[in-house]
Amino acid sequence: MYKSRLQELCQQRRWAPPEYTHRCAGPAHAPLFGATVSVNGVEFRTPEDAARSAKEAHNIAAKAAFDHLSSLPLPPPPPPSENQSSYKSQLQIYAQKKGKLLPSYQTIREGPGHASRFKSVVTVDGKAFESPEYFHTVKEAESAAAKLALMSLPQEASSSEQVPVQPLSYKNLLQELAQKHGFSLPVYSTTSDGSVQVPMFKSTVVFQDGSFQGEPANTKKQAEMNAARVAFQHFEDRRKNALSSTVLRGPHLGQGTVHISAGQVKIAEPVFSVPLASTATSHSATGATDRDYHSLGSTNPLPIAKSTNCADVHIQPCEFKDEKPAFPEPKTVLEVMDSSPELTPLEDAYSAPVASTSTVSSSGCGSDPLASASTVNSTGCGSVPLASASTVSSTGCGCSLLTNRVQVYPRRPDLVLPEGATVLPFSDDVWVAVSLPTLNH
């Protein structure tokens, strides 16, 4: 049959299938038929009375078309299939380098089932590109759409120099963070979503009692990397916020003073937790000279009593400047517990160590002498007496505290309070005041 041979010829030449029409002439009991066939835009007709049936007329027209078309030279061969597939491969490589979703193709079909033509629309990086014309196969249509997309996208994308730098391995960074701080290792959970051709993965990592979900990705490895990046950046931001708050919040200077008629006791709190220094100013019989010393790291001068002659130093009786009535109250001891830093003199090179603990004890408020006085070494005028504890005895001076004994400590994370100690309400961010049971003297 020439109809089948003509059909094969059209497929070889990549033409559309032939289209047939027929005509009927003559009486109804003896009709005669003629046919017309259209192949690649050219029509071939038979005479009006060429056949007694339409099928025979179609075959005669197909023979005429086949004889004419088979004598024509063959068209140039189509481009190799590998060139067509290379456009799709290049477009897929571009999307992977850019970290985008893989290209998706949508096919548009036109014409009857036996003579269909196809167009393709490819979507990449949120942009759609349609093939410029219809093709006889889906493969050709997709290749044309991919070629158009590659030509329309930025040209630098195809250059080997534009290959992005390998991103940081956030999975390794998160694991190093866990090992450094003794945390449990991160646990990843990945789910797959989307079609088989274009799979999508979502990953969630559980780390330090927190769950972090990353952006979807085309591969499981990239999805886990995205989740690890979210978790790592969360802990990095929290660490930076903690550092900035620590720098901005500094200890505030505070000073508490108890005024005494013949002496003064100061509790100074220098900047950045420089240890306290308690000073007592004494007046000797022949006169005394006060010299100022600075504690290292502090701008507050600390007055130190220094005798300039060899006479014995007599400490005058003291009384509190307080308007409260003198009722007998429990004995009160105030201690500042800390180590004393090195002191540097302002005027000369006298060496004057300062006691690390200053104690003010109360046993009387009148003219009673001090219960325990500082030891004075009068062997020479150039030496300064050392005082391990200055004790002032006073009772019933109108000064009352919650308990019998108070100690002040610098606030530290590793601070351990003595047994039975109670934190007092006037403690702050720098110092901790605690009350202790009565001392047994």
UniProtKB/Swiss-Prot annotation:
KW RNA-binding (keyword) present: yes
Q: Which Pfam families match?
A: dsrm (PF00035)
GO molecular function, one example?
double-stranded RNA binding
Alphabetical UniProt keywords: Repeat, RNA-binding
Q: Which domain of life is it from?
A: Eukaryota
Q: What does the UniProt record say this protein does?
A: Binds double-stranded RNA.
Q: What is this protein called?
A: Double-stranded RNA-binding protein 1
Q: Name its species.
A: Oryza sativa subsp. japonica
